[in-house]
């Protein structure tokens, strides 16, 4: 069995794989709670990807489970990494592209990862990872309007889209954040289709189902794309 751990800005996500088959997933704000959900498994290999520093105590907990490998932007993958500043590339972005490569090998694809940040990652049909873009995610947009102004309240995220015309401050903030992000995603997809008419679009990340609902179109969503990508890389090296 393989254990895949993805340390994000907000939560830690984990997946258990038997070869290439995903057997179980979990997510938690603490490593202890996450690992407790995998107690019944014995692991041969562990792959870790992180965008945050992992405390030594947490690493000790992981190492008790098995031999660990860290995934970084310089790790060998089936993709050719053409990013200009490889050392600054977030491991989650490359891992998501590797996950999409399992689905679209031989075709161009754009991964839209809707999490704390909204990340766009493009790979051409030759398997060259070229990069993309990063912008604030939905919760970050809502929080920023509160933290960078004196009087705007903090409006919590919910799954219901705001009306086009907000008739009070809270609904106006929701409209700007929610419909603004939705319009951004629609616009970026259109630009990529102009750049490459054959590009495949795949969504992942915690807010992906929310975007799918707002786009009202037949889009492909895989919430476990990063975990699958990391597992494929681990198997690639075994």
Residue ranges and their predicted role:
Residues 1-11, 15, 21-109, 126-238:
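Nucleotide/phosphate-binding catalytic cleft detector across ATP-hydrolyzing
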Residues 112:
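Catalytic metal- and UDP-sugar-binding loop of GT-A-like glycosyltransferases, i.e.
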